[in-house]
């Protein structure tokens, strides 16, 4: 299946993908995990401090980074074919926005067709990849950034770049929004320790869609799921001021 995580800066997109990698590695001992970073912003030491077993993650060839949509298609296809149809696998692309297409790399940036070919290329690529992923036991997580929907009088004010291909081929589409910075006072000095994120699932073929939840991301730790779970239990009336209701 394909999962698309979309969000603006500081919405824990990479952190959420990292959490998925951590959970996968510890659950599937015989599985294969790959992370492809296209923005030159991923810190392995920080990810390891959050619990990611970096030695068990395939980070690709640093001498041959993914630059284009075509590079990504070839790399993911090789990953799927290498592990076979039965072995569980997870492949994270972070992010789709940093990829160009081969035609764009060759032409002048001032040409009128700039950017249009990438959307067409992505549509063709995901149509082919969706079938390969369906026949395999691989989860593909695609991280996307948001762009202002310039000229939009109605509807969404933001959109992802690269066209609408993932709207059709993704099984899950999750939008993340930054709500506020979490702070606490230490020795009379207010210090930030995390961020509060709202996650809205706008498409879901494996569970109930159009649901939202808030969770905390703590710097140097990751997703604070315990607090999120407690808040959810309070919200649905299963947790009182003392403890669980019977």
Regions found by a protein language model. Name each.
Residues 3-5, 34-36, 58-60, 141, ...:
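Hydrophobic/aromatic beta-strand patches that form the interior of the parallel beta-sheet core
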Residues 3-5, 89-93, 138-140:
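Generic beta-sheet signal
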Residues 1-28:
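Glycine-rich P-loop/Walker A and Walker A-like loops and their local beta1-loop-alpha1 context
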Residues 115-236:
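Phosphate-binding/switch region of NTP-binding enzymes
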